Amino acid sequence: MSLVETDWLEKNISSVKIIDCSWHMPQTKRSGLEEYKNQHIPNSIFFDLDANSKKEINLPHMLVDQNEWGQIISKMGIDNEDEIVIYDNSDVISSCRCWFNFIYFGHNPKLVHVLNGGLKKWIKENKEVTNDVTNIKTTDYKSFEKKELVKNKEQVDLNIEEQYFKVIDARSKERFDGKVPEPRKGLRSGSIKDSFCIPFGL
């Protein structure tokens, strides 16, 4: 993953596409979209992680299909050749999920970055924020899937026996060990057999 610093973004703010992908766990009662409307980095576009995930399934935040992704990004005014900086204002680093989506759907990895420290660091450094609406000109974004980047349940089940690859769980150690309930209703506690816990907050 490519990180860029706040000073770099400030200097290059007019030459990159900026995405706010703030998302919060339901129990926080916070809305990334409402917070974006209140203040965001100038020229940034909001990426709604809930709205831009697959809706025909009862699991949250599953990837949409290739055509739908192209439509979503076209409406955001992003071209295939654009350099992109993604940030968030959340405790779950949702910008990294948005980054993965772009990589999975074929955007050049050298052109997709995450802002180190996110909006919190940007504001702490007294850099400019706004509530102005960003003008968007629709594009014709072309996407393709790098399906090797995602494993399905059958592949993970087989891997428990065959050990073809390592499985890393980025949740907290308490959730990994099943000592606390999952924050989303209907999900069992615990972890995949033989997986490793490396919490994203480290």
Tell me what each language-model feature is.
Residues 7-32, 166:
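Hydrophobic alpha-helical membrane-insertion signals
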Residues 38-41, 45-76:
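Aromatic- and Gly/Pro-rich amphipathic surface segment
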Residues 60-159:
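Thiolate-centered catalytic microenvironments shared by cysteine-dependent enzyme domains
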Residues 191-202:
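Active-site-adjacent "gating/activation" loops or surface patches in catalytic cores
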Residues 18, 44-46, 112-114, 167, ...:
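Conserved beta-strand scaffold positions in the cores of enzyme catalytic domains, especially
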